[in-house]
Amino acid sequence: MLTFNLNAISSSFSVVPFHANYPLSTQTQLLVPSNLSYSFATTGTRKFKSFQLKAGFWESIKSGLMKNNSMQVIDPPSADEEDEEPLPQEFVLVEKTEPDGTIEQIIFSSGGDVDVYDLQALCDKGWPRRPLSKLAAALKNSYIVASLHSIRKSPGSEGNEQKRLIGMARATSDHAFNATIWDVLVDPGYQGQGLGKALIEKLIRTLLQRDIGNITLFADSQVVEFYRNLGFEADPEGIKGMFWYPNH
């Protein structure tokens, strides 16, 4: 179990997505934040948690995404640090122009509008298939569902956009103190571009803005060190993640 360490937030903060998905293997660890204090009610604490993330968010995205001059990272509306407003539920994260004039936008959304059939199609590209009814229930019962959609616009094809789900992550929560991140998926064709980092960082930022400070996730053993380097800690203060499995 890995926990996100609030004290480790810096201007260079970024998070590498984990690749553990149901069913959990015996080599999976639950990762959680080391700051386990529940005193998150004061305005000063909220500002500390959200504003420390602000500086490094777009810089980390740009460093991973801007590989040529035809790609543009579009910043969301800025806000004064003393009175930061929550980011919009949907905005253009990346826009790039291909040699043939086709424009592709990567849209980030935290509104939870993910089609279950689109999600199943994404899972079929490298993750275990799950029953549609359970996928729908998981989405419905999540606290936050964050997604990435690719929208492609070809020259002369106004009104005929191609929209495709290319990434998703979700969080469950008690709506007060704790949240766990699940099902981090990025289309293999879009991996290695920093989109997974952007997706998870935005999800964490949204949780912190909602005054939820204990953020955990599951990670395969081979990526635990990546999370330690990014502010997550395994077994903070000796606290263990425990699992119950049926005996049959």
Swiss-Prot record:
- Superkingdom in the source lineage: Eukaryota
InterPro entries registered for this protein in UniProt: Acyl_CoA_acyltransferase, GNAT_dom, NSI-like
Chief localization class?
Answer: cytoplasm
User: Which EC number(s) are documented for this chain?
Assistant: 2.3.1.-
Domain N-acetyltransferase intervals: 106-248
Q: Which GO terms describe its cellular component?
A: cytoplasm; nucleus
Q: Which Gene3D superfamilies match?
A: 3.40.630.30
Q: Name one GO molecular function term.
A: N-acetyltransferase activity
Is Nucleotide-binding found in the keyword set? no
Q: What does this protein do?
A: May acetylate histones H2A and H3.
Q: How does this polypeptide assemble, per the annotation?
A: Does not interact with the effector Avh52 from the pathogen Phytophtora sojae.
The family note in this entry says: Belongs to the acetyltransferase family.
Supply the name of the protein.
Probable acetyltransferase TAP2
Q: Which organism is it from?
A: Glycine max
